Curated annotation (Swiss-Prot):
GO terms for molecular function: manganese ion binding; RNA binding; RNA-DNA hybrid ribonuclease activity. It catalyses: Endonucleolytic cleavage to 5'-phosphomonoester. Its EC number is 3.1.26.4. GO terms for biological process: DNA replication, removal of RNA primer; mismatch repair. CDD domains: RNase_HII_archaea_like (cd07180). This is Ribonuclease HII. The lineage of its organism: Archaea, Thermoproteota, Thermoprotei, Desulfurococcales, Desulfurococcaceae. Residues 2-210 form the RNase H type-2 domain. Manganese or magnesium. Binds 1 divalent metal ion per monomer in the absence of substrate. May bind a second metal ion after substrate binding. One of its GO terms (cellular component) is ribonuclease H2 complex.
Amino acid sequence: MGIVVGVDEAGRGSLVGDLVVAGFAVEEARLGELQSLGVRDSKQLSPAARVELYREISGVGFFTVEAIRPWEIDGENINILVTKAVEEIVSRIVSYLGVHPSLVVVDKYGDVQGLRLALTRLGIEPRSILVEEKADSRYPVVSAASIVAKVVRDARLQVLRRMYGVRGSGYPSDPETREWVREVFARGEAPRVIRYTWSTVRKLGGPWRSKKAGRNRSLDEFLGG
């Protein structure tokens, strides 16, 4: 029986918190069950609906996730980091299930060549690798991965709310998140849960730095060190 794997991510553009990459593996014969459950792109679902589907799809297939931390994103190209995460996820699935998937479907991002090389290193046949834009809305197995990634990211963000008082969705377009970040910087704090290479940090008066030019204003300078 063939295994199909879907891969998607959540939190790429977030200013606060992790980028979560998820892989969902299911037997080909059970793909129809995902459709029957109403699985679709997580962005089209309410938080409550995502959590409910997360529970239901847990009984249909196997999933695993990788979290990419803000300081990792600040230090390396985000697409390369995602490729490494996808490689680890698929490697874990192969190891756990003991078989190579007959098909791996990935929602397209900016390192397609690197992704294909990484998956072929794992023994995945090139013809078994499908990378498409909007795969999360076209393939239920990728939609399932999208739901897992979003639910896990939301849960991790909830932890940051309790630990740091983070407000809002974590995205730079969210006024609540921007106000929280502004307040943090006004207190002279620089928690590691923020992505300091995002231009929003500079706009909000924080210790922004450029990946290309190095630190424009170091954390030590910002904190008075």
